[in-house]
Amino acid sequence: MPPSLRKAVAAAIGGGAIAIASVLITGPSGNDGLEGVSYIPYKDIVGVWTVCHGHTGKDIMLGKTYTKAECKALLNKDLATVARQINPYIKVDIPETTRGALYSFVYNVGAGNFRTSTLLRKINQGDIKGACDQLRRWTYAGGKQWKGLMTRREIEREVCLWGQQ
């Protein structure tokens, strides 16, 4: 993990899991995180319309140029949704850093994939390290392994493990 991102994530810890996930996704400067940023909608590597820091959905307006403030609002809304979707399935206490890494992960892969994952099963068995290690398995999109996803998962894994070692 780049030192600037590590420092930004550490600074976000007091703000809770959503703040941690937001910093992971946006990065220290707001456009150098795990998702990058595009203010104009585009199709991602699997053909899904995407805007800002990875926002997807029917509310994307094609042809619109989004502002930084609009992108921040979309991310905050999306991360609150992720939290509501997955928190009920996590049955054990986990550190906020682990939860923040999971929010970032689920923001990328979707709550449905998380709910049926070995990763969640391991968390609920109390095997946090084993769960965090499972992140390394999620590096494919469209049937192809992507270096960017490998890098992302290593960073999410590192944050997931904070406080565990």
UniProtKB/Swiss-Prot annotation:
Top-level enzyme category: hydrolase
Catalytic positions are: E35 (proton donor), D44 (nucleophile)
Endpoints of the signal sequence = none
Q: Name one GO biological process term.
A: cell wall macromolecule catabolic process
- Molecular function GO terms recorded: lysozyme activity
Query: What Enzyme Commission number(s) appear in the record?
Result: 3.2.1.17
- The protein here is known as Lysozyme RrrD
Question: Is Hydrolase among this UniProt entry's keywords?
Answer: yes
Look up the further comments and give them.
Encoded by the cryptic lambdoid prophage DLP12.
**Which keywords, in A-to-Z order, does the entry hold?**
Antimicrobial, Bacteriolytic enzyme, Glycosidase, Hydrolase
| Record-linked SUPFAM superfamilies | Lysozyme-like
Q: Does the keyword Hydrolase apply?
A: yes
According to its UniProt record, which reaction does this protein catalyse? Hydrolysis of (1->4)-beta-linkages between N-acetylmuramic acid and N-acetyl-D-glucosamine residues in a peptidoglycan and between N-acetyl-D-glucosamine residues in chitodextrins
> Which family is it part of?
Belongs to the glycosyl hydrolase 24 family.
- Phenotypic consequence of gene deletion: Mutants are unable to form wild-type biofilms, which could be due to altered peptidoglycan metabolism.
